[in-house]
Amino acid sequence: MHFLQRPQRQNNIHQLTNLTFHTPDKRYSLLFQWLYLTGMRSGEAIALSKDDVHITNNNASVVINGTMMYRERSIADMKKSDSTKTAAGMREIDLPKKAIAIYNELLELNPNGQFLFQTTKGTPFQLTAINTYLRSHKADMKIDKKLSSHIFRHTHISKLAELGTPLYAIQDRVGHENSDITEKIYLHVTKGVKEKLKEDIEKL
């Protein structure tokens, strides 16, 4: 796994933010924002039912209990699996206010149908279509790196690490059964933060 140094990483995050919030297609934009804010796997997100999101006066969360089954299936036959990619993937995570706003916007955008994220035809998103969309629009946003929908999940982990969120809490949030991936990202980012601190204390 290749890691970027902090200035490069910050620049990439800025580019991804532009891509996420300024994508011309509203439905893709909302999906990318959701992936960035939740750290969910793409297959988990596009499999969400509207009733998987729970909002009360004091709390908002989403239950992640499946992934989209799409291989060797027509769009009409795509459906949600009974479990996630791993046992640790079966989880419930808190939603920030921005994600709640996206949820409410999606309900207005997709008043019919089971799935939270839908195309203009009312069908579920296809993972291949999402990645194709990213590749076709990255040049417009001046992003010169290879892109897939997984980049939003990695960016979510990196940002939480920079903010000082404990490793175990990040692992629990993103549903990593094998913590190696999360730990590698976390250790790399926190190392960069420590190096920045060394530079800062020299300015005291």
Task: Name what the model sees in each region.
Residues 18, 74-77, 163, 184-204:
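DNA/chromatin major-groove-contacting recognition/catalytic segments
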Residues 18-28, 38, 93, 109-115, ...:
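Short, basic (Lys/Arg/His-rich) helix/loop patches that form interaction surfaces
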Residues 1-48, 58, 88-90:
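Basic, Lys/Arg- and aromatic-enriched nucleic-acid-binding interface segment
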Residues 2-8, 65, 96, 118-119, ...:
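Residue-level detector of conserved, well-ordered beta-strand and adjacent loop positions
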Residues 14, 48-51, 155, 184:
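Structural detector for helix-capping/boundary residues
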Residues 48-105:
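Conserved tyrosine-mediated DNA breakage-rejoining catalytic core shared by Y-recombinases
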Residues 61-64, 148, 159, 168-189, ...:
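Short functional hotspots where side chains directly engage DNA or cofactors
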Residues 46-47, 124-127, 188:
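Gram-positive cell-envelope targeting signals
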